[in-house]
From Swiss-Prot:
F(1)F(0) ATP synthase produces ATP from ADP in the presence of a proton or sodium gradient. F-type ATPases consist of two structural domains, F(1) containing the extramembraneous catalytic core and F(0) containing the membrane proton channel, linked together by a central stalk and a peripheral stalk. During catalysis, ATP synthesis in the catalytic domain of F(1) is coupled via a rotary mechanism of the central stalk subunits to proton translocation. In plastids the F-type ATPase is also known as CF(1)CF(0). InterPro entries: ATP_synth_b/b'su_bac/chlpt. This is ATP synthase subunit b, chloroplastic. The gene is atpF. It is a single-pass membrane protein. It comes from the Eukaryota. The chain crosses the membrane at residues 7-29.
Length: 185
């Protein structure tokens, strides 16, 4: 910075001053002077502004990095919580699945047992019905045999009995009944 100021003083001290204001058309002579003045002013005054801009930019970058780190940490925490929740949900889903399968097996077993019981009751009912029908058929056959035997016996009696035999049978029966009556008295 001191070199720029020294060169500026040197140039100002060696420039001839005219009494009036005029344009210098010598491009080679005027450009280095103008450039050195502009550069000197820019460096002198712009140094603070540039430092402020760089400091602000540095602070914004650091702030952005810190915010990004905080967001990253929060995101990692949320991810871990989500993973924990997912694990819990998977465990619950497995429990529901296992319980559901065991419930299905239990219901299946109950249904099989109920069906077996129903079939057993139907088999018993069928057997009872068959037994009842057999007894009924046997009773009908007995009744019919008895009726036919009775009719045959009555037919035989009617054909064999005459009035005299009939009268003696009745008298014998009356005598038996009379004897039974005396025994009971």
């Amino acid at each position: 910075m001191k070199n720029v100021t020294d060169s500026f003083v040197y140039l100002v001290g060696h420039c001839p001053f005219a009494g009036s204001f005029a344009f210098n058309t010598d491009i080679l002579a005027t450009n280095p002077i103008n450039l050195s003045i502009v550069l000197g002013v820019l460096i002198f005054f712009g140094k603070g502004v540039l430092n402020d801009l760089l400091d602000n930019r540095k602070q914004r970058i650091l702030s952005t990095i810190q915010n990004s780190e905080e967001l990253r940490k929060k995101t990692i925490e949320q991810l871990e919580r989500a993973r924990d929740r997912l694990r819990k949900v998977e465990i619950e889903a497995d429990e529901y699945r296992i319980n559901g399968y065991s419930e299905i097996e239990r219901e299946k077993t109950n249904l099989i047992n109920a069906t077996y019981d129903s079939l057993e009751r139907l088999e018993n009912y069928k057997n009872e019905t068959l037994h009842f029908e057999q007894q009924r058929a046997i009773n009908k056959v007995r009744q019919r045999v008895f009726q036919e035997a009775l009719q045959g016996a009555l037919g035989t009696l009617n054909s064999c009995l005459n009035s005299d035999l009939h009268f003696r049978t009745i008298s014998a029966n009356i005598g038996i009944l009379g004897a039974m009556e005396e025994i009971t008295d």
